[in-house]
Protein backbone atom coordinates (compact mmCIF):
# COMPACT_ATOMS: atom_id res chain seq x y z
CA UNK A 1 0.00 0.00 0.00
CA UNK A 2 1.24 3.50 -0.81
CA UNK A 3 1.47 5.35 2.50
CA UNK A 4 2.96 8.66 1.35
CA UNK A 5 3.54 10.50 -1.93
CA UNK A 6 5.96 13.43 -1.87
CA UNK A 7 7.62 15.42 -4.61
CA UNK A 8 10.76 13.27 -4.76
CA UNK A 9 9.73 10.00 -3.04
CA UNK A 10 6.90 7.51 -2.70
CA UNK A 11 6.67 5.44 0.48
CA UNK A 12 5.16 1.96 0.23
CA UNK A 13 4.25 -0.50 2.97
CA UNK A 14 5.05 -3.95 1.59
CA UNK A 15 2.99 -7.11 2.09
CA UNK A 16 5.41 -8.21 4.84
CA UNK A 17 4.89 -4.88 6.68
CA UNK A 18 8.33 -3.50 5.73
CA UNK A 19 8.48 0.04 4.37
CA UNK A 20 10.20 0.96 1.11
CA UNK A 21 10.96 4.50 -0.04
CA UNK A 22 11.20 4.83 -3.82
CA UNK A 23 12.52 7.89 -5.65
CA UNK A 24 9.75 9.10 -7.99
CA UNK A 25 12.15 9.03 -10.97
CA UNK A 26 12.46 5.23 -10.51
CA UNK A 27 8.72 4.82 -11.09
CA UNK A 28 9.29 5.81 -14.71
CA UNK A 29 12.46 3.83 -15.43
CA UNK A 30 11.89 0.56 -13.52
CA UNK A 31 9.11 -1.98 -13.05
CA UNK A 32 7.50 -2.89 -9.74
CA UNK A 33 5.37 -5.84 -8.71
CA UNK A 34 1.97 -4.86 -7.33
CA UNK A 35 0.52 -7.65 -5.17
CA UNK A 36 -2.84 -5.93 -4.65
CA UNK A 37 -4.52 -7.84 -7.48
CA UNK A 38 -3.62 -11.14 -5.83
CA UNK A 39 -4.99 -9.98 -2.49
CA UNK A 40 -8.22 -8.63 -3.95
CA UNK A 41 -8.89 -11.64 -6.21
CA UNK A 42 -8.60 -14.09 -3.33
CA UNK A 43 -6.31 -16.38 -5.33
CA UNK A 44 -2.58 -16.95 -5.54
CA UNK A 45 -1.13 -18.42 -8.74
CA UNK A 46 0.53 -21.80 -9.04
CA UNK A 47 2.55 -22.15 -12.24
CA UNK A 48 4.83 -25.18 -12.22
CA UNK A 49 5.72 -27.97 -14.59
CA UNK A 50 6.23 -31.69 -14.17
CA UNK A 51 8.93 -32.91 -16.56
CA UNK A 52 7.93 -36.24 -18.09
CA UNK A 53 10.16 -38.73 -19.88
CA UNK A 54 9.13 -38.55 -23.54
CA UNK A 55 10.26 -42.13 -24.11
CA UNK A 56 7.56 -43.29 -21.67
CA UNK A 57 4.68 -41.95 -23.81
CA UNK A 58 2.71 -44.80 -25.37
CA UNK A 59 -0.76 -45.93 -26.41
CA UNK A 60 -2.96 -47.47 -23.71
CA UNK A 61 -4.09 -51.05 -24.17
CA UNK A 62 -7.83 -51.78 -23.76
CA UNK A 63 -7.11 -53.64 -20.49
CA UNK A 64 -5.28 -50.58 -19.13
CA UNK A 65 -8.17 -48.30 -20.06
CA UNK A 66 -10.57 -50.68 -18.30
CA UNK A 67 -8.40 -50.62 -15.18
CA UNK A 68 -8.24 -46.80 -15.27
CA UNK A 69 -12.04 -46.60 -15.36
CA UNK A 70 -11.95 -47.40 -11.63
CA UNK A 71 -10.67 -43.84 -11.13
CA UNK A 72 -13.79 -41.73 -10.71
CA UNK A 73 -12.04 -38.72 -12.22
CA UNK A 74 -11.18 -40.63 -15.42
CA UNK A 75 -14.33 -42.64 -16.12
CA UNK A 76 -16.18 -39.94 -18.10
CA UNK A 77 -12.99 -38.84 -19.88
CA UNK A 78 -12.23 -42.35 -21.13
CA UNK A 79 -15.81 -43.00 -22.25
CA UNK A 80 -16.04 -39.69 -24.12
CA UNK A 81 -12.57 -39.99 -25.65
CA UNK A 82 -13.17 -43.56 -26.84
CA UNK A 83 -16.42 -42.51 -28.58
CA UNK A 84 -14.70 -39.50 -30.15
CA UNK A 85 -11.81 -41.59 -31.48
CA UNK A 86 -14.07 -44.41 -32.68
CA UNK A 87 -16.11 -41.88 -34.70
CA UNK A 88 -12.95 -40.29 -36.10
CA UNK A 89 -11.41 -43.63 -37.05
CA UNK A 90 -14.69 -44.86 -38.59
CA UNK A 91 -14.60 -41.80 -40.84
CA UNK A 92 -11.30 -43.02 -42.23
CA UNK A 93 -12.93 -46.19 -43.57
CA UNK A 94 -10.59 -49.12 -44.13
CA UNK A 95 -7.57 -46.92 -43.42
CA UNK A 96 -8.84 -46.41 -39.86
CA UNK A 97 -8.40 -50.10 -39.15
CA UNK A 98 -4.63 -49.79 -39.50
CA UNK A 99 -3.01 -48.70 -36.21
CA UNK A 100 -0.65 -46.37 -38.03
CA UNK A 101 -3.60 -44.33 -39.39
CA UNK A 102 -5.87 -44.40 -36.35
CA UNK A 103 -6.02 -42.01 -33.43
CA UNK A 104 -5.62 -43.76 -30.07
CA UNK A 105 -5.61 -42.89 -26.38
CA UNK A 106 -2.17 -42.30 -24.85
CA UNK A 107 -0.96 -42.50 -21.28
CA UNK A 108 0.16 -38.86 -21.56
CA UNK A 109 -3.25 -37.55 -22.62
CA UNK A 110 -4.93 -39.62 -19.93
CA UNK A 111 -2.53 -38.34 -17.25
CA UNK A 112 -3.10 -34.74 -18.37
CA UNK A 113 -6.87 -35.28 -18.15
CA UNK A 114 -6.49 -36.81 -14.68
CA UNK A 115 -4.39 -33.88 -13.39
CA UNK A 116 -6.91 -31.35 -14.73
CA UNK A 117 -9.85 -33.16 -13.14
CA UNK A 118 -7.93 -33.59 -9.88
CA UNK A 119 -7.35 -29.82 -9.70
CA UNK A 120 -10.98 -29.01 -10.59
CA UNK A 121 -12.11 -31.15 -7.63
CA UNK A 122 -9.42 -29.97 -5.18
CA UNK A 123 -11.12 -28.02 -2.37
CA UNK A 124 -8.28 -25.47 -2.10
CA UNK A 125 -8.03 -24.59 -5.80
CA UNK A 126 -9.95 -21.41 -6.68
CA UNK A 127 -12.96 -22.32 -8.84
CA UNK A 128 -13.48 -18.88 -10.41
CA UNK A 129 -9.95 -18.25 -11.71
CA UNK A 130 -8.04 -19.77 -14.65
CA UNK A 131 -7.12 -23.44 -14.43
CA UNK A 132 -5.28 -25.30 -17.16
CA UNK A 133 -2.93 -28.21 -17.64
CA UNK A 134 -0.89 -28.07 -20.84
CA UNK A 135 2.19 -29.43 -22.56
CA UNK A 136 5.06 -27.03 -23.13
CA UNK A 137 7.96 -27.25 -25.57
CA UNK A 138 10.02 -30.40 -24.92
CA UNK A 139 13.56 -29.87 -23.71
CA UNK A 140 16.56 -31.79 -22.40
CA UNK A 141 14.78 -32.43 -19.07
CA UNK A 142 11.73 -33.95 -20.76
CA UNK A 143 8.25 -32.89 -21.77
CA UNK A 144 6.98 -30.23 -19.36
CA UNK A 145 3.36 -30.64 -18.28
CA UNK A 146 2.50 -27.22 -16.89
CA UNK A 147 -0.02 -26.80 -14.11
CA UNK A 148 -1.52 -23.32 -14.00
CA UNK A 149 -4.15 -22.60 -11.38
CA UNK A 150 -4.86 -20.45 -8.33
CA UNK A 151 -5.21 -21.36 -4.68
CA UNK A 152 -8.20 -20.02 -2.77
CA UNK A 153 -5.95 -18.66 0.02
CA UNK A 154 -3.30 -15.98 -0.55
CA UNK A 155 -1.41 -16.39 2.74
CA UNK A 156 2.13 -17.46 1.92
CA UNK A 157 2.48 -20.43 4.29
CA UNK A 158 -0.99 -21.76 3.42
CA UNK A 159 -0.29 -21.29 -0.30
CA UNK A 160 2.98 -23.25 -0.03
CA UNK A 161 1.15 -26.04 1.79
CA UNK A 162 -1.55 -26.25 -0.89
CA UNK A 163 1.04 -26.24 -3.67
CA UNK A 164 3.05 -28.97 -1.93
CA UNK A 165 -0.10 -31.05 -1.42
CA UNK A 166 -0.89 -30.85 -5.13
CA UNK A 167 2.61 -31.91 -6.19
CA UNK A 168 3.13 -34.61 -3.51
PLM regions: where:
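Soluble accessory domains appended to multi-pass membrane transport proteins
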Residues: 1-95
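Residue-level recognition of well-ordered beta-strand positions that form the cores
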Residues: 51-53, 134, 146-150
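Short, conserved charged micro-motifs
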Residues: 59-62, 155-159
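Intrinsically disordered, low-complexity acidic Ser/Thr-rich regulatory segments
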Residues: 93-116
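Short, hydrophobic beta-strand segments
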Residues: 95-101, 142-155
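Short secondary-structure junctions
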Residues: 119-130
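Short edge beta-strands and adjacent turn/loop segments
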Residues: 129-146
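Short, non-transmembrane amphipathic alpha-helical segments
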Residues: 160-168
